[in-house]
């Protein structure tokens, strides 16, 4: 596995046929995973039980589970403290920081369309991020 999916990246992927084509091989090879904070965030968009079940099935079929590390809280506190020194600690949500901690722990790159991850990565040297629109880079 190479990438950990963020909801912003998934929304773009699901809505853009060009991105679906560009990332098809990575999805097919199970190179893109998801973690429960991201799935929970995306499942919030389900309009009813049927759609909730469809989304849950999509995650199970396409995006392997990546476990959130037990030490995520320490990583988040450290990074948030560094971000506060430059006044950027409010740029990333709690879910974004959980996803970032999970990616950093597993050595995965966050696949996103969210400038917040670039901000977090400037303060977390063990975090890498990649915008889903940057295909082939």
Model-derived regions: residue spans:
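Acidic, PIN/NYN-like endoribonuclease modules and their adjacent C-terminal/linker elements
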Residues: 1, 100, 104-137
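Short, well-structured N-terminal submotif of metal-dependent ribonuclease cores
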Residues: 1-34, 44-57, 136
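A general structural signal for well-ordered alpha-helical segments in protein cores
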Residues: 20, 39, 52, 73-77, ...
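Structured helix-beta-strand junction loops
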Residues: 28-30, 61-62, 86, 106, ...
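Active-site-proximal, substrate-binding regions of enzyme catalytic domains
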Residues: 50-72
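Active-site neighborhoods of divalent-metal-dependent phosphate/nucleic-acid chemistry enzymes
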Residues: 64-111
């Amino acid at each position: 596995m190479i990438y950990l999916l963020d909801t912003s990246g998934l929304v773009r992927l699901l809505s853009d046929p060009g991105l679906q084509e560009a990332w098809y091989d990575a999805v097919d090879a199970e190179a893109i995973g998801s973690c429960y904070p991201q799935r929970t965030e995306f499942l919030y968009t389900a309009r009813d039980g049927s759609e909730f079940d469809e989304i849950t099935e999509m995650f199970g079929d396409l995006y392997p589970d990546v476990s959130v590390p037990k030490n995520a809280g320490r990583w988040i506190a450290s990074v948030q403290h560094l971000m506060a020194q430059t006044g950027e600690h409010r740029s990333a949500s709690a879910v974004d920081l959980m996803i970032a901690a999970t990616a950093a722990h597993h050595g995965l790159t966050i696949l996103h369309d969210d400038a917040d991850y670039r901000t977090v990565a400037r303060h977390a040297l063990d975090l890498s991020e990649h915008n889903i629109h940057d295909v082939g880079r």
